[in-house]
Amino acid sequence: LYRTKEPGIRLETNLFYLPNNEQNLAYRAAALLMEEFGVKEGVSIKLKKFIPVSAGMAGGSTDAAAVLFGVNKMFGLGLSIKELMERGVKLGADIPYCLMRGTALSEGIGEELTPLPQIPQCQVLIAKPGISVSTKVVYESLDAMELKQEDHPDIDGMIEAINRQNIHEIAGKFGNVLELVTAGKYPVIGEIEQVMKEEGAVNAMMSGSGPTVFGLFTNPQAAQNAYEKL
């Protein structure tokens, strides 16, 4: 993120298919603050993506959060993290969490965040199959389904497990209703989870709307073995 004398926002990315205009959350994040505070100078954003696109990992929200934080600091706007979160939710439900970070209980559309203790140290293996998923389509499909009570994760049980700092209990409380939609359409998601578990993951689950899968390991070698097998 660079400050420029020339007014306006310039966005460069390392991926040719990413938009470099107001269709990009990073661009919109800069515009949001600069317009509100009447910033006369410009900003140059060089975005190098590592988080896969359309992977259910809040990659765009992470970019936007970084830009909000950077523009606030660079131009001395004086906003607190809470104030940035209040603005960020206007752009995307995941942005407040990306600004707060850590472990949290997320309620509402994602803007109501309650900090929780960090989970115990472990290894996390992330695997994205060669497919992309539209979050909008997944949520629309979920809305059309009739969910039972047992389809929903045990949030209270998860919080208790986190407070007890028991990684096995935490993993045992995994749950993601969106997996009913995405994994039902793409069996490879369940296949990846199975490989991780067979190689020693305490549990594995789809991230967000998918298709990315993550597994928790307490043994670094087991995580490495799963990585090599996948």
Predicted segments with their positions:
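Residue-level signal for inorganic ion chemistry
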Residues: 1, 26, 60, 94, ...
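Structural signature of FAD isoalloxazine-binding scaffolds in flavoprotein oxidoreductases
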Residues: 1-5, 67, 98, 120-123
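Short, basic/glycine-rich phosphate-binding loops at helix/coil junctions
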Residues: 6-14, 19, 67, 164-174
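Contiguous, small/hydrophobic- and glycine-enriched helical/loop subdomains that border
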Residues: 42, 64, 68-105
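Glycine/serine-rich anion-binding loops at beta->alpha junctions
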Residues: 46-75, 93, 202-217
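Conserved, helical-rich catalytic subdomain that frames metal- and/or nucleotide-binding sites
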Residues: 100, 105-203, 218-228
